[in-house]
């Protein structure tokens, strides 16, 4: 293949979307029965089972947060395609090994390894972000985000069916095959023109931030990513219990809870490309602030709903707003960083996202234990409202600085 030929960024986008879909599906395939597998490995008793289930779930995000900056640095040196291949193949091997474990410690170690070797989605975001024309980046990143969301929606349904049909362990092997397909698709169809940077010429993490035109804004975007994940995860531990409180006695609690849990993903699939395209026209910063404010306005009434269907409608609308948030953040990150450091900027953002994935459920569980289920939505709304104000100030400061520069 001619390395000087122009890269078809749209083809790369669609292939990366497929890879993100496979990765999202693979990760979520095992989620419906994670606690059951922990129990199968010898953990007995309600408290012990809850504790170990929480630990094996969280440890993946913790190790991902630690490892992401290292992989981002390597991506800036060796290219993003190599990181995609490393991630897909590494996760495939780890998933296959998970199907062979004999005790909880082996499983815990492999869940940590999964976090270390992960990172397909942020590297796909970085790859597409630096290849796409700037005036199409909102649409492109919004479209790409629907891949992982779509996979994450399908995964639990398929995983539950496969576990019921074949048992728990075979699902890990099936997941490994899905990830290996992702590796093959990436290897044969993704194209990248690499401009290698020597280790000697690499900037340190501090130098990367100093080299940015607006490091304060970039840091505020990292914080926004963290808050988005905190807001998403804070409801997860209490959602089924809250639905049970709203529904009363019902025979299909699992179905209703599952539908209400999944419905934001459906609306995010519909909204992300459209709002991303709108962001290309009016500016991603306007989309970001508007959707943060809309999220606050939707979270508050969730604390006062009287039926599961009222909650479902609000969560559908919230998903439409949430679907635009991370693509808007990623678009702004690429606007305010050079291609030479894009890998690390996206990896730092992933670390903040992973921290949010861990702290969100902890916040929700602690607030609900102290003040009840409804308080979780009010506390989450307060956190998002503070972040919306902080984001507005940061973006306004950036706009004022640009006006001063133009005047000079």
Curated annotation (Swiss-Prot):
An example Gene Ontology CC term for this record: plasma membrane
Subcellular location: Cell inner membrane
Top-level taxon of the source organism: Bacteria
Protein name, as recorded: Multidrug resistance protein MdtG
UniProt keyword list: Cell inner membrane, Cell membrane, Membrane, Transmembrane, Transmembrane helix, Transport
Membrane topology, as annotated: Multi-pass membrane protein
Naturally occurring in which organism (per UniProt): Dickeya zeae (strain Ech586)
Matches recorded under Pfam families: MFS_1
InterPro entries: MFS, MFS_dom, MFS_MdtG_subfamily, MFS_trans_sf, Mutidrug-R_MdtG, Tet-R_TetA/multi-R_MdtG-like
PANTHER family: MULTIDRUG RESISTANCE PROTEIN MDTG
Family, as annotated: Belongs to the major facilitator superfamily. DHA1 family. MdtG (TC 2.A.1.2.20) subfamily.
CDD domains recorded: MFS_MdtG_MDR_like (cd17391)
Transmembrane segments: 13-33, 51-71, 89-109, 112-132, 138-158, 170-190, 221-241, 253-273, 287-307, 375-395
Gene3D superfamilies for this protein: MFS general substrate transporter like domains
UniProt GO MF annotations: transmembrane transporter activity
């Amino acid at each position: 293949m001619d390395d000087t030929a122009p890269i078809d960024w749209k083809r790369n986008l669609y292939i990366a979307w497929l890879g993100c879909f496979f990765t999202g599906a693979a990760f979520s395939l095992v989620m419906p029965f994670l606690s059951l597998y922990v129990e199968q490995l010898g953990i007995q008793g309600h408290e012990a089972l809850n504790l170990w289930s929480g630990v094996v779930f969280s440890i993946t995000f913790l190790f991902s947060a630690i490892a992401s900056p290292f992989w981002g640095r390597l991506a800036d040196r060796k290219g993003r395609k190599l990181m995609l291949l490393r991630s897909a193949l590494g996760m495939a091997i780890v998933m296959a090994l998970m199907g062979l474990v004999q005790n909880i410690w082996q499983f815990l170690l492999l869940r940590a390894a999964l976090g270390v070797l992960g990172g397909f989605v942020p590297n796909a975001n970085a790859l597409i972000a630096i290849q796409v024309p700037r005036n199409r980046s909102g649409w492109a990143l919004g479209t790409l985000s629907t891949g992982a969301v779509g996979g994450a929606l399908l995964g639990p349904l398929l995983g539950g069916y496969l576990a019921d049909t074949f048992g728990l362990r075979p699902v890990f092997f099936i997941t490994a095959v899905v990830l290996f397909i992702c590796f093959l698709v990436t290897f044969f169809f993704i194209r990248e023109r690499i401009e290698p940077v020597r280790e000697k010429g690499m900037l340190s993490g501090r130098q990367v931030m100093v080299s940015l035109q607006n490091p304060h804004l970039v840091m505020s975007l990292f914080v926004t990513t963290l808050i988005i994940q905190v807001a998403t995860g804070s409801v997860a531990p209490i959602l089924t219990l809250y639905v049970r409180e709203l529904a009363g006695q019902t025979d299909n609690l699992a179905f209703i809870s599952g539908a209400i849990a999944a419905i934001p993903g459906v609306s995010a699939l519909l909204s992300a490309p459209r709002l991303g395209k709108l962001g290309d026209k009016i500016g991603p910063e306007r989309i970001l602030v508007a959707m943060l404010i809309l999220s606050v306005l939707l979270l508050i009434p969730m604390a006062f709903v009287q039926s599961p269907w009222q909650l479902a409608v609000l969560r559908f609308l919230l998903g439409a707003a949430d679907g635009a948030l991370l693509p808007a953040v990623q678009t702004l990150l690429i606007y305010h960083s050079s291609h030479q450091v894009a890998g690390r900027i996206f990896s730092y953002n992933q670390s903040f996202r992973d921290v949010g994935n861990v702290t969100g459920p902890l916040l929700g569980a602690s607030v609900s234990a102290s003040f009840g289920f409804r308080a979780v939505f009010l506390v989450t709304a307060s956190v998002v409202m503070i972040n919306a104000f902080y984001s507005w100030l940061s973006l306004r400061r950036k706009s004022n600085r640009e006006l001063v520069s133009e005047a000079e």
